[in-house]
Amino acid sequence: MSTIVKICGLTTADTLEAAVETGADMVGFVFFPASPRHLDIDFADALGRQVRSRAAKVALTVDADDDLLDAIVEQLRPNWLQFHGSESPERVRSIKRIYGLPVMKAIAVAGPEDLSVLPDYAAVADRILFDARPPKDATRPGGLGAAFDWKLLDGVNLKLPFLVSGGINAGNVAEALRVTRAQGVDVSSGVETSPGEKDPDLIRDFIRAARAA
């Protein structure tokens, strides 16, 4: 199976085009005001129309309420929902039933104890994303450029695909895939020149490096 490549937190037409034209499988739009990559739904919808059917559109939320999810699904019509907060397995199951969309659930990792929740989420999610656990004083749960110890995933055996994220860039994506044996990678800050400012060339370089790994 080809490596799943997701570029998350896209905010401009040119960076989105760089992602889809270079072959990203998934493009992520963030709906979380604390993030420098946050979009309003109208602008995300305009970017989504640019995608057409060239990649899967992913709506990333953090403990979103039903009203926000209703608006995102109705207007953006995403292919995937990604939950990056403290959503419970029961919440994931309920939302899948309501919208009929696949869900990718992020699990924050700092130590082996963080993997204890994995069986419960693997039973309800369609994909798992392992990301670095943020510092306690962080205002957002991801996109911070921090990595976790990839060796913690040694021995993880899931029946569904999983992706890794956190501190990954074109220079280390091959190593991340080798160590974790993940089916895919998700990048945000690793293709930015400053928080929220993605660079088309960095996006292209990352996708090519992931494909070559």
From Swiss-Prot:
Alphabetical list of Pfam families matching this protein: PRAI
One GO biological process term: L-tryptophan biosynthetic process
EC number(s) stated in the UniProt entry for this protein: 5.3.1.24
InterPro entries hit by this protein: Aldolase_TIM, PRAI_dom, RibuloseP-bd_barrel, TrpF_fam
Keywords: Amino-acid biosynthesis, Aromatic amino acid biosynthesis, Isomerase, Tryptophan biosynthesis
Catalytic activity reported: N-(5-phospho-beta-D-ribosyl)anthranilate = 1-(2-carboxyphenylamino)-1-deoxy-D-ribulose 5-phosphate
GO molecular function, one term: phosphoribosylanthranilate isomerase activity
Source species, domain of life: Bacteria
Top EC category: isomerase
Pathway: Amino-acid biosynthesis; L-tryptophan biosynthesis; L-tryptophan from chorismate: step 3/5
UniProt family annotation: Belongs to the TrpF family.
HAMAP family in alphabetical order: PRAI
Protein name stated in the entry: N-(5'-phosphoribosyl)anthranilate isomerase
Organism in which the protein naturally occurs: Rhodopseudomonas palustris (strain TIE-1)
Gene: trpF
